[in-house]
Amino acid sequence: MLWPYARSRNKIYFLDMKKLSLILLIICLFNNYVNAQNNVQEPYPKLTIGLEWGYIVSLNSIYHYNFYAPEGFRVDEKGSRWGFTSNADMYLNVGCNLNPEWNISLYIGYAGVGDYHKILPISLRGTRYFGTDPMQDRWFAFADAGSGICLKTPVQEILTAKIGAGYEMSLSKDTKLNFIVAARSTYTHPGIQFDDHRIPMKNTNRNNAIVSALSFGLGLTF
């Protein structure tokens, strides 16, 4: 049986905490400046920034692999795997409240995909709030889609899509705490393991997989 997997062999160096803190500070200051320019009667901030954390449960992977085995023959395999794999994700978002009921935001983050590899996704999300008073707790629904890269050798592009809903607690005019549930799908490109051999990309014609998952998260917007 063919069991695919992906392991990143290159170390990915991210911004250190000082640089990240500086970026967040600049965004916060800009957020405060823009919101201060709003009319004093405006019941909600125009510019929003936030952080989001989540727990991901991957349930299914539909895959199609086409490659040359170490012995030289060609292998074409399609299938679907069911299982339970847990991961986590984290996002930074910057957005705009179009009105009290609609928000559009750009999300940049880091997430795991099944038992394959990690990804760096970037997506655009539209959120619909049910209730016109931003100072009150309310329900919401959202959908987002985007692209990104998978952190493996070689790096390949991925596609993501997500729909979900949640409940927003209003802590203040500018600060909201969100409880989120979502269904998500990721189109990615795992590495391939065949008979204890890792198949190099030069011998790989196709390494596609669609991973379906559920996620449960918390978000803080201000």
Located regions from the model:
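Cleavable N-terminal export/targeting peptides
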Residues: 1-45
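Residues embedded in well-ordered secondary-structure elements
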Residues: 25, 29, 40, 83, ...
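Generic domain-boundary/flexible-linker signal
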Residues: 31, 62, 137, 176, ...
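Short glycine/proline- and aromatic-enriched beta-strand/turn motifs that initiate or cap beta-hairpins
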Residues: 36-96, 211-222
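Transmembrane beta-barrel strands of outer-membrane/channel proteins
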Residues: 49-61, 106-110, 143-149, 165, ...
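Flexible, solvent-exposed loop segments that connect beta-strands
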Residues: 59-82, 88, 106-122, 149-155, ...
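Gram-negative (and chloroplast) outer-membrane scaffold detector with strong preference
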Residues: 91-164, 169-177
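A generic hydrophobic-segment detector
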Residues: 156-216, 222
